[in-house]
């Protein structure tokens, strides 16, 4: 077996040596170059067989290469320009490896030069791609190694450094995801319950509130009506009148009481139209007597349905709500430091009773406050008529007495009663309103 292998190796080496010996280097003398130029001028560059027959040991291929490579002065020698490289690549894409046809397209270059240049370009391209692959793999490897080594470094860091690094990462995420991060923050931050919609009378009133208010909207706080705002006065008077008339009609349950209540309401509305104070009132107040009857029925049904729930004790009574059920001569201010007599706050008490009537529609909208203070949080409110006792008798009043009492209580006139004595206990306003 070993002998056969040795023999095969010897035969291969002998064949290679024979091929090397057969390889003949073609040399051209000056006489042969002169003969080649003369034959080309006679026969041109198309009849290489006739030209090669004039030589003893030259083939057609050797003659053609000698002419195009060394003797022809029209062909370029030296480096290739980028334009020639682009033209060569496009021609090779069209003609393939037909170098003679490609040489006709690339002017000034022989077929052999075109072939050699294309192989050189292919080698450069392959080398460049190999280098880019190696560089990409190296960068990926470095990133992978860095990703593995970073936790080891973070273990040795102090907690302060870790917090700084985490905050830095959060900043980067906020910069990259600016819109989404801001949207998420806006969704998470919840506005307090005290921020209420300002729905007074439209755009004009909103602009007036924005100009006269001292509250800065940039702080995220809501804007509310002041205690002495004319809108509050108008709404309170309307609410008190409607409630008192409905209770009176409900108590009498006669057509005469309905007509009297309707007359009082018409007089009040006519005065309200003439007075600028009531321009903030209810916009659709011009209703008919049938609608007034429906309103009374609604108030009657609502009062009967909610009477039991209003009598239930409230576990979270606020100091402001406890003032409604008290009959003392002194009203406690919310600040807890000052007391005032009742006669000085008659109009304030009217507004508080009206606010109590409006609470079931929007409990957070209008709450009694002191001075120029504005609402900052929702307050627990005692339900309507919770403090009324069933045993209080309902006195009977004539028409003149009833109108006098209405004027005294400030329903037709916003000024307090001048004859009120601050040293005496106040009249039972709730009983009077209930009876009216």
UniProtKB/Swiss-Prot annotation:
Pfam families: Myb_DNA-bind_6. It is found in: Nucleus. Keywords: Auxin signaling pathway, Cell cycle, Developmental protein, DNA-binding, Nucleus, Repeat, Repressor, Stress response, Transcription, Transcription regulation. A motif (Nuclear localization signal 1) lies at residues 8-15. Residues 1-11 have a biased composition (Basic residues). Residues 48-71, 99-122 bind DNA. A motif (Nuclear localization signal 2) lies at residues 151-158. Residues 319-328 have a biased composition (Polar residues). Expressed in all shoot organs with higher levels in leaves, stems, flowers, siliques and floral buds. Also detected in roots tips. Disruption phenotype: Abnormal stomatal clusters formation composed by two to four adjacent stomata and some unpaired guard cells originating of extra symmetric divisions in cells with an abnormally persistent guard mother cell (GMC) identity. Abnormal stomatal cluster formation is complemented by FAMA. Increased accumulation of CDKB1-1 in single flp-1 and double flp-1 myb88 mutants. Induction of ectopic precursor cell division and delayed stomatal differentiation. End wall thickenings in all first generation GMCs. Residues 1-23, 309-328 are annotated as: Disordered. Induction: Strongly induced by auxin in a IAA14/SLR1 and ARF7 dependent manner, especially in xylem pole pericycle cells, lateral roots initiating cells. Interacts with RBR1. Transcription factor that binds to DNA in promoters cis-regulatory element 5'-GGCGCGC-3' of cell cycle genes, including cyclins, cyclin-dependent kinases (CDKs), and components of the pre-replication complex. Binds to DNA in promoters cis-regulatory element 5'-AGCCG-3' of auxin regulated genes (e.g. PIN3 and PIN7). Together with FAMA and MYB88, ensures that stomata contain just two guard cells (GCs) by enforcing a single symmetric precursor cell division before stomatal maturity. This is Transcription factor MYB124. It comes from Arabidopsis thaliana. The lineage of its organism: Eukaryota, Viridiplantae, Streptophyta, Embryophyta, Tracheophyta.
């Amino acid at each position: 077996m070993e002998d056969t292998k040795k023999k095969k190796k010897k035969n291969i080496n002998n064949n290679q040596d024979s091929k090397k010996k057969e390889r003949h280097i073609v040399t051209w003398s000056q006489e042969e170059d002169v003969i080649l130029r003369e034959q080309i001028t006679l026969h041109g560059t198309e009849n290489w067989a006739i030209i090669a027959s004039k030589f003893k040991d030259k083939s057609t291929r050797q003659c053609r290469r000698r002419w195009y490579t060394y003797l022809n002065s029209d062909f370029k020698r030296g480096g290739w320009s980028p334009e020639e490289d682009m033209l060569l690549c496009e021609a090779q894409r069209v003609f393939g490896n037909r170098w003679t046809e490609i040489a006709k397209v690339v002017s000034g270059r022989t077929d052999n030069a075109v072939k050699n240049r294309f192989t050189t370009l292919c080698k450069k391209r392959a080398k460049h791609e190999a280098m880019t692959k190696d560089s990409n793999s190296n960068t990926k490897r470095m990133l992978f190694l860095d990703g593995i080594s970073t936790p080891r470094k973070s273990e040795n860091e102090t907690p302060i450094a870790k917090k700084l690094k985490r905050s830095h990462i959060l900043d980067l995420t906020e910069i990259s995801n600016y819109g989404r991060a801001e949207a998420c923050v806006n969704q998470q931050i919840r506005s307090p319950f005290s921020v209420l919609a300002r729905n007074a009378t439209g755009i004009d009133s909103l602009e007036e509130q924005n100009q006269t208010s001292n509250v800065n909207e940039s702080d995220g706080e809501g804007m509310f009506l002041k205690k002495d705002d004319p809108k509050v006065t108008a709404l309170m008077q309307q609410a008190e009148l409607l409630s008192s008339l409905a209770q009176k009609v409900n108590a009498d349950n006669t057509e005469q009481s309905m007509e009297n209540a309707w007359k009082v309401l018409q007089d009040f509305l006519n005065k309200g139209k003439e007075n600028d104070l009531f321009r903030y009132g209810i916009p659709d107040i011009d209703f008919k007597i049938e609608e007034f009857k429906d309103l009374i029925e609604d108030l009657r049904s609502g009062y009967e349905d909610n009477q039991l729930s209003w009598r239930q004790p409230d576990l979270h009574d606020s100091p402001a709500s406890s003032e409604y059920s008290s009959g003392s001569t002194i009203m406690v201010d919310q600040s807890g430091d000052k007391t005032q007599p009742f006669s000085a706050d008659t109009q304030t008490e009217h507004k508080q009773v009206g606010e109590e009537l409006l609470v079931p529609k929007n409990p957070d909208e209008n709450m009694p406050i002191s001075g120029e203070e504005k609402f900052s949080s929702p307050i627990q409110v005692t339900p309507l008529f919770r403090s009324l006792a069933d045993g209080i008798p309902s006195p009977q009043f004539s028409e003149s007495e009833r109108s006098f009492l209405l004027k005294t209580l400030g329903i037709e006139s916003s000024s307090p009663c001048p004859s009120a004595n601050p040293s005496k206990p106040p009249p039972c306003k709730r009983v009077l309103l209930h009876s009216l």
